[in-house]
Amino acid sequence: MKKLFSTVSKPNILLIVVDSLKSDKCIGKNLSSITPNIDFLIKNGAAFSQAISPAAVSPVAMSSIFTGLFPFRTGMSADRFRKLDSDITTYVKILKNHGYNTFATAPSITKDFGLTNDFQNSDSTYENSVSLFDGLGNKIVQMLSSIRTQTPWFFYIHIFDLHAPITVPKNFSAEKFGKSKYEKMVSAIDYWIGEIIKNVDLENTLVVLTADHGDYIPVIELDNETIDLEASDGQAKMDYIMWKLGHKVPAKLQPLKGKIRHILRDSRIKSNEKKMNGLKLSPYQKRVMVETRMVGGHRLYDDLIKVPLIFSGVNIPSNKKITQQVRHVDIFPTIEDVISLPKKNDIDGESLLPLINGKKIHENPAYIESPPELPLDVSDIVKEKIIGVRTSSYKMLKQENSGNVVELYDLVSDPLEEENIVSSSPELVKDMESKLEEIMANKKITTTQNKVDLDKIERELEKLGYN
């Protein structure tokens, strides 16, 4: 029988972040991936199907997770990418102050943004292009074995295998593992999640599984036919090579590599658009088949910001499935509550433990914003920052500087966000603006950062394919 209350004063904490994992690809019905280990965590825990990331880019999202603060209070909300404000007390620091040993295994991009500064292991990051199947999975398992006696511990694992370009291992390439390459890779990642949780004492460990953001999957069913615009094996291999080379190219040659990547990307987009010509596609179908999370537009559709959130293990009741909207900023306040730490003051998130335990709590609106831009933008990128607010029922987006409300969606009747109702719903716009204004009341002026740091950050993001 599952233990609901730990007799150990300080349980271990395992945070698994699967980069780019969409909520509807691991929680709910009609899943084509094989995920017995994620299913095990859900069965033995609480699963939230409507968790919202503040932005569809890793550093901004992770800063909100680690601080419980919206991006405009972490120093990450600006016209350019920035490092996490070093004056902010993260939950990792708080855990260390309460006797926790802190460890991380995360892609090197997290270090560039100051997200792994508070972890004690010197090998807290790995090269962004390294896969679980390149030895990283074994390294994580070995790490779990080595820290077993260093209780209590907090271990942050950030899995990058689902981040484009996706290269599916041969053992998971069969159709039974998923309809798309993306879904096959979810099956592959689930295997390693199983290996990880085998090495964890769930009676004395709180396991949290989530994602930083989602992604578009360019595969649709049309007239009983499957149209698949995911990168072919050859394209994926070329993308992977370019990605890996990106970390070896000298800084002075990065602009040339960037131009080559732009040419290849633009050529692929035009090719995809040509393939779509003549097809009767819905706005949603056209969006997922042609657009990309890495570049262009506000990138605030649910495909990109709705992520899974699962709490499992010590002090968590079993088989709780919760559809109420929650947010990234709620994750650590919940962890704090589960392990009975004093509450961190002046945060934007709140504990979900009462909701997990069956109590009704008020649903909080989620703040969302478009990612910062890189200086080498192409003409189709939105120049003015878009900010917004989301509830379970509606989503509103507005231009931050001009204040113009540009999009409004009824998420109940239009979950694919195909019909912009902003012009026909003035009262609703007013109500949503009021919610956003209340959230923004604590807006903080972003601190100035060293230009060398900013330039380095932008070079690293360009290597990953952001533009």
Model-derived features: positions:
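Catalytic domains that recognize anionic headgroups
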Residues: 1-467
